[in-house]
């Protein structure tokens, strides 16, 4: 595997980029965005061609993993064309998608055909009423049918992501894990990240650490720590009698900054060097000043490594320092 040209001032190589191709979503999950969310003007969102060019630029600089996220990426018109463009880049050996699952019934097979290797599906509850409460607009049965379609479509791997909140869905953690493991899917439980101002709940009240959750799950599963990583921040535990694993993403209790290998591009073309900092570079301005040219983009990406911070500064007890919502950042 080629070494990345993208090396920050702390010696970390960036080999993974997350592209948020839209800030729009057909859900309004309470931890992700406001119910009356104002979205970007469409002219401010990068075109699919601009995202494809960014993918090529990152690949030429040694990135080997691209994850497409949103908002909900699959509601973007003609997004399959972007996956086809990214899937055609030989040096990208891991093309992934994060989705809420609402469009997978019709798009799972086209995604596999376009070259997508792995997908993560967000699923925080198996209770229909609670699903409506958490997502505001979502339909649980549609998502479950989408997951079934994905399981039959031929992806190399399907993983579930669950954000756990103490008074919303903590009591379902074991059921969610069982649902995933019995179907051969890994599941990652995520500590809620303090991005954007929300009014539906208090993050510090709802917080449960990964260690607390793992101890609770140990009542239902015999868990053994593994050294397995998939290029992301999950720490995985093997559940006895299952081939799949349970992971924990712990930005508060066990941050993953020292091994950070990723950057993000927002729907509006901001290169975010850190999930929990506002350090960024305006790639849209460069893309539109030099349409179709890859070298100015590569130069900007290399130069941006100098401002990638050592770590994030998440603090549940303070007002959020990052005012952009998760749908703007790329979940």
Swiss-Prot record:
PANTHER family: MOLYBDENUM COFACTOR BIOSYNTHESIS PROTEIN 1, MOLYBDOPTERIN COFACTOR SYNTHESIS PROTEIN A
Protein name: GTP 3',8-cyclase
Self-association state and partner proteins as the record states: Monomer and homodimer.
SUPFAM superfamilies found in the cross-reference section: Radical SAM enzymes (SSF102114)
PROSITE patterns: MOAA_NIFB_PQQE, RADICAL_SAM
Source species of the chain: Saccharophagus degradans (strain 2-40 / ATCC 43961 / DSM 17024)
Root EC class: lyase
Obligatory cofactor(s): [4Fe-4S] cluster
Catalyzed chemical reaction(s): GTP + AH2 + S-adenosyl-L-methionine = (8S)-3',8-cyclo-7,8-dihydroguanosine 5'-triphosphate + 5'-deoxyadenosine + L-methionine + A + H(+)
HAMAP family documented for this protein: MoaA_B
InterPro entries named in the record: Aldolase_TIM, Elp3/MiaA/NifB-like_rSAM, MoaA, MoaA_NifB_PqqE_Fe-S-bd_CS, MoaA_twitch, MoCo_biosynth_MoaA/MoaC, rSAM
The record's free-text note on cofactor binding: Binds 2 [4Fe-4S] clusters. Binds 1 [4Fe-4S] cluster coordinated with 3 cysteines and an exchangeable S-adenosyl-L-methionine and 1 [4Fe-4S] cluster coordinated with 3 cysteines and the GTP-derived substrate.
Function field: Catalyzes the cyclization of GTP to (8S)-3',8-cyclo-7,8-dihydroguanosine 5'-triphosphate.
CDD domains recorded: Radical_SAM, Twitch_MoaA
Family (UniProt): Belongs to the radical SAM superfamily. MoaA family.
Gene Ontology terms describing biological process: Mo-molybdopterin cofactor biosynthetic process
Residue ranges annotated for the Radical SAM core domain, each copy included: 9-233
Residues that coordinate or bind GTP: 18, 67, 98, 159, 262-264
């Amino acid at each position: 595997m080629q070494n990345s040209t993208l090396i920050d001032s702390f010696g970390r190589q960036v080999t993974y980029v997350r592209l948020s191709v839209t800030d729009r979503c057909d859900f309004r999950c309470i931890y992700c965005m406001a119910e009356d969310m104002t979205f970007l003007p469409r002219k401010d969102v990068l075109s699919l061609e601009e995202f494809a060019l960014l993918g090529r630029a990152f690949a030429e600089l040694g990135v080997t993993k691209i994850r497409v996220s949103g908002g909900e990426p699959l509601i973007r018109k003609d997004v399959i064309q972007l996956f086809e463009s990214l899937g055609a880049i030989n040096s990208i050996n891991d093309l992934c998608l994060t989705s809420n699952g609402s469009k997978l019934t019709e798009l799972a097979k086209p995604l596999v055909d376009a070259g997508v290797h792995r997908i993560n599906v967000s699923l925080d509850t198996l209770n229909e009423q609670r699903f409506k409460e958490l997502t505001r607009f979502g339909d649980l049965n549609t998502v479950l049918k989408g997951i079934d379609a994905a399981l039959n479509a031929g992806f190399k791997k399907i993983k579930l992501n669950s954000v756990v909140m103490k008074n919303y869905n903590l009591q379902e953690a074991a059921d969610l894990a069982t649902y995933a493991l019995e179907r051969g899917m890994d599941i990652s439980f995520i500590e809620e990240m303090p991005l954007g101002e929300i009014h539906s709940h208090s993050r510090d009240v709802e917080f449960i650490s990964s260690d607390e959750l793992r101890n609770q799950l140990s009542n239902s599963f015999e868990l053994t720590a593994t050294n397995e990583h998939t290029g992301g921040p999950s720490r995985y535990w093997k559940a006895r009698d299952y081939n799949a694993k349970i992971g924990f993403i712990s930005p508060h209790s066990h941050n993953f900054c020292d091994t950070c290998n990723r950057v993000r591009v927002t729907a509006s073309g901001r290169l975010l060097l850190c999930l929990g900092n506002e350090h960024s570079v305006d790639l849209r301005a460069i893309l539109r000043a030099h349409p179709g040219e890859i070298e100015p983009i590569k130069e900007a990406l290399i130069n941006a490594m100098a401002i990638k911070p050592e770590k994030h500064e998440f603090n549940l007890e303070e007002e959020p320092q990052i005012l952009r919502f998760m749908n703007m950042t790329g979940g």
